Amino acid sequence: MKKGLKLLSLALVLTLLFSCKKDSEGTPATSGKTAKFTITANGVNSSDDYVSFVIVGGDTKGTKTIWKVNGVTRNNEAAISLGKDDFTGSTKTYVIETVLPVDVITTSVQSLNFNASYQISYKAEIDGKVITNDDGVTVDVNKDYTHQFDY
């Protein structure tokens, strides 16, 4: 009985000793990715055209302030939406960037035309690499620009 108890104790000690693992000495890798979108629309008519750019990002922490637009941080906004009225004034180009690394990004783009044509450009850079670069796309009554991208 004593011999069995000693063997069991020894087995328990050895199990505990070898099941403990040394902590990693390196710092954990930063997760997430950075993004920069450049969107231009020229010739948009607010009464005849439909333009919609929606960019949504998120991280695992539920951070709400994700984006800056043309250098201005958009507090408490995880999504940015641009419509036809954003392109009929003096600003025709918008640069939308993450203010911190995010885990998921999705974009939805729809440009329709019902009269005179207009041009759009959509460029997506993820971690500094150009992923999508549709430059000078003409949108007219026969050709729309409708896409959904996940990065």
Predicted regions and their residues:
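Bacterial Sec-dependent N-terminal signal peptides
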Residues: 3-7, 13-38
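First exposed extracellular module after export/assembly in secreted or surface-exposed proteins
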Residues: 28-151
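Low-complexity, intrinsically disordered regions enriched in charged/polar residues
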Residues: 1, 7-11, 47, 99
